[in-house]
Amino acid sequence: MESPCRTITLEKNGTSLEPVHYSVQGKEILQIFKENFQKEDPVLFLDGTAGEGGHSFLFLKEFPNSRIILCDRDPIMLSRALTRLSDFSERVVSIQTNFSEINQKLLTSYGIDQTPQGILLDLGISTFHLFHSGRGFSFRESEPLDMRLNPNSGQSAEEILNIYPKDRLMNIFYTYGEERWSKKIAEVIVETRKQNSISTTFELANLVSKIIPRKFWPPGRHPATRIFQALRIEVNQELAHIENGLKLLLDLLRLGGVIQVISFHSLEDRIVKNSFRDYAKQNGFELLTKKPIFPSQEEIDENPASRSAKLRILRKTKSVDKKYRNKNFEEEEE
């Protein structure tokens, strides 16, 4: 999976800042909130994947009386987001946590006695993680195989590669990477690590490149792309966190509130799609996207990696409100 972001440079008080995350589908997401909340409303937002703070910046700027709960499992990312949002510091509460661990008890411990009205999850990995973290998310540089979004918690990719049995590795590569060469790759990894541990991105990328015949390499992508994706998902338990997190957040969402989720590959999107559909069948939830909203061609031209983004939206209401309709949402579900 490519990075759903590009690098841009901002200026503040005439001083150039380091590159920051590009907010995928920022216009569409902001428009949905504008259609559901008044500009002067004291909206409480929850950004469950703060990243560089790009989306949160848009919300705080558009809704001058709003507050935001800023969450990220990575303490470095949270710090970067807070720096970007420094002009709004009095309206920001930051919590270093995974969005799958957010509940009212946690919010109360931070002095928040209300539930959020607007929730956003951007499930893409940031430019910082890919190219600047040094944690082995990309094979463009030789880096340690870490891949932990929270560098202080859990097993690293190196530990998984050098400890997991062959069948478990094969299942990870096939299930999370949809890699047809999973069995052969797992076999070679197990044989290789008997002599030397696999510890860097280059070592893993070169190993996979030698296993998959060149005629089967995916067009325009490195042959190890799927393996890196699968490892990252396993290291961070990403799919489990999405499934569990949606349950907690949909329960937490205030009546009349809206949750928006951007996914970037089919495994993520399937969970979001099915979860939203199941909740929409219950009295009290309305699916606002019968089909996902894709980035505009203008955005794709500006940021090609955003082309894989899918935005899905759900609203919490006592009864299904048929008044809200948008031409983007009228198509039948795929």
Curated annotation (Swiss-Prot):
It comes from the Bacteria. The keyword S-adenosyl-L-methionine applies. It holds the Pfam family Methyltransf_5. It is an enzyme of class 2 (transferase). GO terms for biological process: rRNA base methylation. Keywords: Cytoplasm, Methyltransferase, rRNA processing, S-adenosyl-L-methionine, Transferase. S-adenosyl-L-methionine binds at G53, G54, H55, D72, F99, D122, H129. Specifically methylates the N4 position of cytidine in position 1402 (C1402) of 16S rRNA. This is Ribosomal RNA small subunit methyltransferase H. It comes from Leptospira interrogans serogroup Icterohaemorrhagiae serovar Lai (strain 56601).
